[in-house]
């Protein structure tokens, strides 16, 4: 019972911090802002996280791990590259619709500014997983044998740009409405 209460409070802190980081920016969000949004004392907040940076790192890690696990499941579910990568894009689009703050934090935030260990979101586990999926598809002759990073950009460049447009409020329709056209453009650039 106590474990659940602790987890709920920690999740609440992370959720409120995510909202503030995406709305105000990391540097414009103070620990006091997070504490006020969570309706808890600063001391309570520090019982869960030792700094604002540790909250940011935990958020990134949680989002990264969820996306990585989803990609692993997609890879297991689909045996054909065409279906697999289309499902990846569908997942990214649906996740953006469900949790735009999470996707904004993952893709927009310049994590290296406050997480010096991180190189780039594009070297994180999910994107390394996608690169691995590309290399396997190339080995199997299912997609063009081009530089793997170029193939990843060909597959995800357009969809990620669509995600940015949706987050920025440029696209009125939900992202899944654009899935077929977006995926066909990506597929044409890598198909054999």
Sequence positions of predicted segments:
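N-terminal intrinsically disordered/low-complexity leader segments
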Residues: 1-8
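Generic hydrophobic, amphipathic alpha-helix propensity
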Residues: 8-17, 34, 55, 59-63, ...
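Helix-turn-helix
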Residues: 12, 20-54, 58
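Hydrophobic alpha-helical connector segments
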Residues: 58, 62, 72-98, 152-155
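Amphipathic alpha-helical packing segments from all-alpha helical-bundle domains
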Residues: 65-68, 72, 115-140, 149-153, ...
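All-alpha amphipathic helical-bundle segments outside canonical DNA-binding/catalytic cores
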Residues: 83-86, 118-124, 139-156, 174-177, ...
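Amphipathic alpha-helical segments used for helix-helix packing
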Residues: 91-115, 162-165
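C-terminal peripheral helix-coil segments that are non-catalytic and often amphipathic
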Residues: 94, 128-139, 157-158, 171-192
């Amino acid at each position: 019972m106590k474990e659940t209460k602790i987890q709920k409070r920690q999740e609440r802190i992370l959720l409120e911090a995510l909202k503030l980081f995406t709305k105000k920016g990391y540097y414009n969000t103070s620990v006091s802002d997070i504490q006020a949004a969570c309706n808890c004392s600063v001391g309570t907040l520090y019982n869960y996280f030792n700094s604002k940076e540790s909250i940011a790192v935990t958020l990134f890690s949680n989002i990264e791990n969820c996306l990585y696990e989803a990609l692993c499941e997609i890879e297991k579910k689909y045996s054909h590259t065409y279906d697999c990568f289309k499902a990846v894009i569908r997942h990214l689009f649906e996740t953006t619709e469900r949790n735009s703050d999470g996707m904004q934090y993952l893709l927009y935030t310049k994590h290296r500014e406050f997480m010096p260990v991180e190189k780039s979101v594009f070297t994180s586990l999910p994107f390394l997983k996608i690169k691995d999926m590309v290399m396997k598809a190339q080995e199997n002759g299912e997609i063009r044998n081009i530089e793997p990073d170029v193939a990843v950009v060909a597959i995800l460049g357009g969809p990620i740009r669509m995600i940015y447009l949706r987050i920025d409020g440029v696209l009125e329709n939900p992202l899944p409405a654009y899935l077929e056209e977006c995926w066909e453009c990506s597929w044409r650039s890598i198909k054999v």
